[in-house]
């Protein structure tokens, strides 16, 4: 149970007692531990402080039994921790210094894994070393010989501040026992219960030593919130994992225009998010209040100190709402288009002056340049790799097509299997369902090389099809200020050299009260007018892909859909469960980054709504896609490729599938990564579950998967495609899919965002005016014929929208200095098991092999989708990276 008092209230404690009454006089009241120095104060007698007690019942039970005296053995304990950063000198800091001097920093208790606890073995740990960022503590126990192996420890934080406990090592005569903690421990004044940590040895529930079973159960109940007596908002120090709907993205109490529907439930199905316990809004009880401060996530889900203070983490995400008004204030015409392309180029070459006192330099050091003490700072973006390699590549049709296979969103291109293209929407509402892209147009554009029937048979036609997804939103989005929308289809033809060529773009508007359905097909032109119309149509089509990428391929399929796996794992899988330990690296920081996204990215009036074409319908649209298209069994890479017609099963092929497009960089690299992950998971699962009965009888494992399906993804719980955990293959498939989504999938759609989207004409996030050929006026046609470049610039995002997106994409594309890349470091529990350690080393070797393969492929000029003059190399699935914006690196988890 957590006390409601804040730490600040602890500062009012009476500390006026003479220090001489507590301990011998010292020359000064200062912390004797300075960075890099050992504490030279006399240590209290450890033997005297070590407490070994027995219960009265045990004494009475054995009172008549004569036994040989039990010998004690000495056990040394070494603890590594990091303190919470607190600025300045506070009363609580003074009290903590007193605790250090008295040698009572942490209370540590040992838990036997052999027999039920008959005695208590505990000691106070004293801080003996402090060298930023780590602190070292030591303690010594006298443990009875028959105590048995230590299976767990309990720790109570005697400080008046939080402590990040990294790990504990116990040194016994027969060897060492390690406890990897990686957890924040609240002060005793806030949480008086002792925190339990289990050793690095993993146990299935049925194999858990009997004395540890009750602790295993109690810890899960704590994380489920069963021991919480209070009601209301969860506090910063709590570790409760629970579910809620997305009812906190709107802010109706602050502005009625920011009211948003609840996302999650029958009307708008969606994955669940972490519960915060905040009060309902006064103006809309179905929504949750968004008052100031950080959104709750369980304490151990928050960023570490390193990530939290870096410009890629908490600091910038929290500051986005205040950063953007300052940037907007220095733009000459924030709501207007850029006047010419040179003005866009100047964002990289000259920059924009910022007031010296804006305070943005520490937050955005990559893009804010300091010119000197007396001069203003400059907002100047680094040129993205796309225009660094070829300044005009974004204009070319071949680059437009190449990016569907090797760009930012390789998840949308699909094979055309039926002709003609026909909508599945109700024609009574949306008009004629048949596409205007006819066989005559296709055969003309492919120069008579083959008929449509031959192209279908030979799998030569591919499409970006956003028609049925967008058409229901067109009229609604067009009612928003300075925004337009079409439903689009973009058709591509596969050439003999495995490159795609755009054939046609169809833009459609549904009928409304004032006019009938409108649609038109645009093709690459060979005269000035048709060329400009084609470029304008291409701009609309690319913006649709950019919005779909951000909302669906990125946010929905990785961030939002992963959160329920994390919540369920912490509620149902013990920290000593082998599957928890296998998945835990893949869950690092995701809940925190999702909470930040709800605060400033996907919230009402946030970046997505302000700068992307769906506007206030963004999450509503992603809900529609989740309800219609999302299937867990199709989230693995091979299944996704097969679903889109980009591969077919072939057991004789290297990865068990044969690609429809041989030079598909994302798929070619991704399948190697997928296989490496699957082989690692297979070795791991078969080690801990040699008998399939162990899977079906594992109540924690079954409880986790049941909660994922029935609560976390409860809006789709009745779907027939959910896997059932009965066999090794079932479990391997589920775990491999989750590991892939959090690592390879997310890396492929995230870390190239600035490289491809930083120059926004390549990836415009919205379009603001209609095609000149839709209900043309004399004035609009005149402007188009006299200044088509001006019309294109008006179609692009405004100066404000473009600049804010560039700042955001730079942030989202940045690797943190403390990034943990897949296969780079192994968990301590893996290293302690020889079979698992060997399997991990094989996994690591396969990832190193992938790095070499990617390097070789990127210099093979026969692979035209990833190599050639000015072509951006495909490196998004290279496993490791330096920190910063690199366009490569696959972290274990969705950490940004």
Curated annotation (Swiss-Prot):
Pathway listed: Lipid metabolism; oxylipin biosynthesis
The keyword Oxidoreductase appears for this protein: yes
Region annotated EIF4E2 binding, chain positions: 175-232
Amino acids binding Fe cation: 554, 559, 746, 750, 896
Cofactor note: Binds 1 Fe cation per subunit. Iron is tightly bound.
Location(s), subcellular: Plastid, Chloroplast; Cytoplasm
InterPro entries named in the record: LipOase, LipOase_C, LipOase_C_sf, LipOase_CS, LipOase_Fe_BS, LipOase_plant, Lipoxy_PLAT/LH2, Lipoxygenase_dom_3
Reported tissue expression: In leaves and inflorescences but not abundant in seeds, roots and stems.
Keyword Oxidoreductase assigned: yes
Primary location class: plastid
GO molecular function terms attached to this record: linoleate 13S-lipoxygenase activity; metal ion binding; mRNA binding; salicylic acid binding
Protein family: Belongs to the lipoxygenase family.
Function: 13S-lipoxygenase that can use linolenic acid as substrates. Plant lipoxygenases may be involved in a number of diverse aspects of plant physiology including growth and development, pest resistance, and senescence or responses to wounding. Catalyzes the hydroperoxidation of lipids containing a cis,cis-1,4-pentadiene structure. Required for the wound-induced synthesis of jasmonic acid (JA) in leaves.
Protein name: Lipoxygenase 2, chloroplastic
Organism: Arabidopsis thaliana
